[in-house]
Amino acid sequence: MENFRQLITASAENYGSRVAFTLKEGKGKYRDITYTRFLDEVRSLGQALIARGYGGQRIAIIGKNSYQWVLANAAIQVEGGVSVPLDKELRYDEFLECLVRSEVTAIFYDKKEKENVEKAMASGETKLKDAFPLYGVVGDGSQTTIFDLMGAGIAQLWNGARDIDELEIDAHRVSTLLFTSGTTSQSKIVMLTQHNIVANVDSVMRLNIIFPEDTNIALLPYHHTFGGTGQWVMLAAGARTVYCDGLKHLQSNFKEYGVSVFVGVPLIVETIYKRIRKSIDQKNMNLGVKAMRVFARGLGKARIDVRRRVFASIQDALGGHMRLVVLGAAAADPECIKAMNDFGVTCIQGYGLTETSPILSAERPDRLRSGSVGQPIPGVEMKIDEPDENGIGEILARGENIMIGYYGNQEATDDVLVDGWFHTGDLGWMDEDGYFYITGRKKNVIVLRNGKNVFPEELEQEVSQLPYVVENIVLGVPDGGNDRDPIVTLKLVYDEKAFLGKTRDEIYDLVKADVEKINDSTPPYKRIRKIIVTEEPMIKTSTGKVRRFMELQKIVEGEN
């Protein structure tokens, strides 16, 4: 496969009557979209966009994960346009800047974005000509919705129009513009082609981990390339996709839909694991569960898998069908991953970036290695550039999934694409079997005055093991304004329920005692020298990544 039209058509041919999406339309009311119907609706919407003059144009999409979001994105691709997915958490000024920088001429939007979209249309600063709601009913007359467009497209196809089928797709032309995380003015715009993303989908399909019998719950935002490409994988594999009613309803949704797989960030699994661990603690079952884990693991080595039966109660709490979780976008807690695997839910970690469409490496269900992000997926090469005495260096990659560059920023493109290799900006090492391990971002490394390097992610992993930790970050905070002599500083967000009746000073002393234990097993130069404790959540991106620079600014400015 080279393009999305081929992918969608092949899925309709292979899985025609199978359900591609199940949509909730009220309490106890559901509507199924088959693969055949999905293809028909993509063709109809794509035809309507061409008829309105948007063939090959840049069109933005903003809103929560939904079937209509997928439909709009697929139609834009199939009509040869350029999709510009935007983060629904953007402030108005950031949203406006994204519209201006990407030069989109139309936008699909969700109900919650209506005010910002109307304001942007009226500003005169963008090139927007049309705004199409992803909600509403056909023919209400006030606005042309996605449903109105589909209706028009159906009529055009019925009357013999075939623009959507006859259009030649250049798979190597820019088809998606994605903003990297960071402040909007500093973010780069990644240019991906249909070939880039389809090549990545094909590589993941060759891992043979998703099947037509699977039900996927779409958790990662579609504007994030991990979530977006993950959805294309589900469509290529013939799986069914459902949508979450909100994270507090996640486990009930698992049971409601019989969810068997999802793509997510470690925070989701770690939250689930903490609930399981809390239940085990309350029932005084620690020793019993530990023994059962050892027992099940031992039989597993003999290729006898009894995990789902031994831990049936945990499986039931996860809906009864959960078998696979694909994790990415952040480092995962090794103990959490090991425990979930023991409970019968295989958690595999992947690694990649927006610029790589995104997946570069992944564990395989039969090749798990604690702490690693697996081996390169088929079609991808990876290596360590200029490794130090510990084998740590920058991770480089090449393959058909690598972006063609940053939009409007040739200098930044030349910085990362050198001699056919993409410089990820991540530091890591590779073991003798080709498994990769991430030690941190180059830009996050704390360089001490003595020249020693502290990788904050390593310390954060240790701190995250403490039972009351909600989230934490380790930063190099300038000592009295001296950037060349940073203090290794921990900021920790704690669970208030864990310290009921304690004063702030008492909480600090308890945390400090635990951190000192971590320091005792850490080389002197790596030790945490300053601690900040708070119950206030940190500033994060919509995918749950802590905005390190903004947190550092708060500390330097004395806001903590």
Which stretches of residues belong to each language-model region?
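Conserved AMP-binding/adenylation subdomain of ANL enzymes
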Residues: 198-215, 222-313, 321
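Conserved C-terminal "lid"/linker of ANL adenylate-forming enzymes
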Residues: 473-478, 516-560
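Conserved AMP-binding A3 loop
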Residues: 32-36, 175-201
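Conserved AMP-binding/adenylate-forming core of the ANL superfamily
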Residues: 17, 21-53, 57-66, 70-74, ...
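Structural core segment of the AMP-binding/adenylate-forming
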Residues: 78-152, 496
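Conserved pre-ATP/AMP-binding loop-to-beta segment of ANL
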Residues: 16-19, 133, 155-179, 186, ...
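Conserved AMP-binding/adenylate-forming
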Residues: 262, 306-436, 442-445, 470
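AMP-binding/adenylate-forming catalytic core of the ANL superfamily
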Residues: 90, 107, 399, 404-405, ...
